[in-house]
Regions:
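A contiguous, basic/glycine-rich beta-loop/short-helix subdomain that forms a polymer-engagement track
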Residues: 213, 220-225
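Amphipathic helical hotspot of TIR/SEFIR-family domains
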Residues: 110-126, 147
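Signal for well-folded cores of large energy- and translation-related assemblies
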Residues: 16, 32-36, 53, 70, ...
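Canonical P-loop GTPase G-domain recognition
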Residues: 128, 138-198
Length: 610
């Protein structure tokens, strides 16, 4: 590290908050390009900050990333925050490392509920935001309205007068310009760099005292083991330096820091020493937990532990015990699933895992929401795991003898014509309309508060009701007494296969009148597997294996052609929302199958009589 990184007044630590798709990652790409942090020969991948495959595919940021930019002789550390409340555990820890936030808002959509969640945390910590109104060159931009909405949002979140007096800058991440007026259409990002340097305070840290820092996130690498990441709060750290680690319970142990790495661009560079205010990664201490304090052995003082939101949704993971178990995956045993879940717990703080005592093949996994858990399942199946997972359920807690359940704030953006059916559907699921604002261009925005269990399984239904044109965003709001009534249950029954084999077109053709199929000709099925949605509300056991009875009278080939409706192929999220309480989702690297918990019909009957 050069001398200028030691001058604490030249250091700025900021976090970026943005709603999905408002252009956060693209903006950071531009900042890296224009500051010259990427050297000429480095090929810059689009959306550099989304490093995980799933993040790129879904366009969401799950883990917070760090990147450092050198501009003139300032060093700016930018930390990316996950925009989604399901990853709330990440958000709070990230904000503890920075001195200000850039709130990125789309110039036509305005602030959204997911940004609200992170902004609320930032304001509560006393950070003063800089508002960046992005995509200013969109034809549908309405910066004045967006600014008013942002001000109202801050006011609703109890911002102080100083926080309400925020700076605003207009930018286009895609075309790489920024300016203080909303008429800006060319130039570069200099005004944004200048604003950050002028308005953000250098870190309030003590460069002289004995070393102390807190671990705010973890990474894992099979070569060096656990890597801790955090901001140095006091003093400096060198490679191979002895430290004392204090965990959140106050237990102490001694260790040594092996490597110290600073961030430069998107790379981690090994450095000899790092100073107060720097965001660093280090190796050599294992085990390590989030919220651990590292300090100089001569001055052992713990920092207050970081709080993490409690999980709100739970589901069961179990060994895949279907007839097709082990055909497609590499990891199929309880031990392998347990090791993988334990490894996930290292860096996924908002996750909780317990092995069931009555059935050690099953694990109860709890997280911040459906998305949080489905991302874990998707990652595991890509790594070669096979397992059965149950329907997500909300976690009911008891406070002073009253049962409470989680509620979510939902924002829905639909065309006027679909408004009625969406409001009706939300009503049947226990939703209460809080606010409604038409945009005057044929769309309307609806805000609801709804029990989380009413939202499970709603997204698929919502997309059908709005013919794919609706947008829906939800964020955990609060716990409140349980609302009477059952919501979110599937209305239709299912079609269940009665044997093992390959499905035949002739049989499927005759079953099409009974409902919509999940399987096509030649798909492998087994007894107890769900192969379609029944058009009525009861389950029906059917035979998809029955071929056509042939006689020797016919001319061959004249009546072979049967017209099959293409089967429904569900994504992981859709399947999790679809399954009922007596069903499991069989997840393997190649397929997602719905099945009954009891595969044989007489077992199901016995269980239903209970």
């Amino acid at each position: 590290m050069s001398n200028n990184s030691r001058d604490i007044n030249k250091l700025r630590n900021i976090a970026i908050i943005a709603h999905v798709d408002h252009g956060k990652t693209t903006l950071v790409d531009q900042l890296l390009r224009q500051s010259g942090t990427f050297s000429e020969h480095e090929e810059l991948q689009e959306r550099v900050m989304d490093s995980n495959d799933l993040e790129r595919e879904r366009g969401i940021t799950i883990l917070s990333k760090n990147t450092a930019i050198r501009w003139n002789d300032y060093r700016i550390n930018i930390v990316d925050t996950p925009g989604h409340a399901d990853f709330g555990g990440e958000v709070e820890r990230v904000l503890s490392m920075v001195d200000s936030v850039l709130l990125l808002v789309d110039s036509s959509e305005g602030p959204m509920p997911q940004t609200r969640f992170v902004t609320q945390k930032a304001l509560a910590l006393g950070l003063k935001p800089i508002v960046v109104i992005n995509k200013i060159d969109k034809p549908s931009a309405r910066p004045g309205w967006v600014l008013d909405q942002t001000f109202d949002l801050f006011a609703n979140l109890d911002a102080t007068d100083e926080q309400l007096d925020f700076d605003v800058i207009y930018a286009s991440g895609l075309n790489g310009f920024a300016g203080m007026e909303d008429t800006v259409r060319d130039g570069d990002m200099t005004p944004l760099f200048q604003l950050v340097v002028d308005r953000v305070n250098p870190p309030a840290v003590d460069p002289e005292g004995p070393f102390r820092m807190q671990v705010t996130s973890l990474d894992y690498n099979s070569y060096v083991g656990v890597i801790g990441i955090g901001r140095i709060e006091r003093g400096k750290v060198k490679t191979n330096m002895p430290v004392t680690v204090i965990d959140p319970e106050g237990k102490k142990r001694n260790g040594r820091v092996m490597q110290v790495m600073g961030f430069m661009g998107l790379r981690r560079e090994e450095v000899e020493e790092a100073h107060a205010g720097d965001i660093i990664a280090f190796t050599g201490l294992d085990p390590l937990n989030i919220s651990d304090t590292l300090c100089d052995p001569s001055a052992v003082e713990a920092l207050p532990p970081l709080s993490v939101d409690e999980p709100t949704v739970t589901m069961t993971f179990q060994v895949n015990n279907s007839p097709f178990a082990g055909k497609e995956g590499k990891f199929v045993t309880t031990r392998q699933i347990k090791e993988r879940l334990d490894r996930e717990l290292i860096h996924n703080v908002a996750l909780k895992v317990e092995q069931l005592v009555e059935d050690p093949d099953k694990f109860r996994v709890s997280g911040r929401g459906e998305l949080h858990l489905s991302v874990l399942i998707e990652n595991m199946r890509r790594e070669g795991f096979e397992m059965g997972v149950s329907r997500p359920e909300v976690i009911i807690r008891e406070v002073n003898g009253v049962k409470e359940e989680p509620y979510e704030a939902v924002t829905i953006d639909v065309e006027d014509t679909h408004q009625g059916s969406v409001m009706e559907k939300m009503g049947t699921r226990g939703g209460e309309l809080k606010d409604m604002s038409p945009d005057g261009k044929g769309r309307v925005r609806l805000d609801f508060i709804i029990p989380s269990r009413g939202l499970i399984g709603f997204r698929t239904e919502f997309l059908t009701a709005t013919q794919g044109t609706g947008l829906i965003y939800s964020v955990f709001d609060h716990y409140a007494p349980v609302k009477p009534g059952t919501f979110g249950k599937r209305i239709n029954g299912v079609l269940i296969a009665n044997g093992v084999g390959k499905a035949v077109a002739f049989a499927i053709f005759n079953l099409q009148d009974r409902g919509r199929m999940f399987i096509g000709h030649g798909d492998e099925v087994y007894e107890g597997m769900v192969i379609g949605i029944h058009s009525r509300d009861n389950d029906l056991v059917v035979n998809p294996l029955k071929g056509k009875q042939l006689t020797n009278m016919r001319a061959s080939g004249s009546d072979e052609a049967v017209a099959l409706v293409p089967p429904i192929r569900m994504s992981l999220e859709q399947a999790l929302e679809f399954i009922g309480d007596d069903e499991l989702l069989e997840v393997t690297p190649k397929s997602i199958r719905v099945r009954k918990k009891f595969l044989l019909e007489h077992e199901r009957k016995r269980a239903s009589r209970g």
